[in-house]
């Protein structure tokens, strides 16, 4: 009796890759070097944090700023980046940058990972995605570095800026500042965070479409829908939050909350102090979320 050899599908390989990264992330976060007070982090809490980082969910059961060391921050930052780009995309991108051609199986994996509708120009796409990510995140980190240098020394400010940039662009919602409430009057940091949230919310396909075509009438239907819908939601939600909360929120605060509620989940104000109407609006925005792709 012969047994057919079952081949692993691209979707299964992608899921397996993420599962392995979650296990690896859990192990790394449990290392004493990853924690400020070694031994205080349970296996469950480490696993929860690793899964949240790789899936860019941003939910936490421990305070990120006070629980993890600098090495732990680096681990989380890498997990977030892998979660945002996808382990398949990163691997394929490294191959593409070496000048080698992707095998058909690799191209199928990338297509599935990025939800790309066609096999055409997959190698060009993945290179563009990586370049776009590096450009946006490094630019935001550079600006953030100057902003954080007002409060921290040069090297710590650089580390915080890089983490904040990666977490924000990938909509992970992690922060190592112990919350952003103390920055509610920092217009520069809020505008930088808003800009990264908007770009991350558009998705790679929209950003690349804008860079290539540059005129609205040349954009794909997907890009037009994303730009129109995002603009409407961001403007409407910001105006409603400002109207409901009044003087307790500045215009920049309202714009920040209106955008991040739908994307990264970062907050510049205590949502628990908001009125029921504002909390309901934020729930609706979280349900809608960012655009696909």
Language model features by range: what are they?
Residues 1-293:
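Membrane-proximal intracellular helices of multi-pass ion channels
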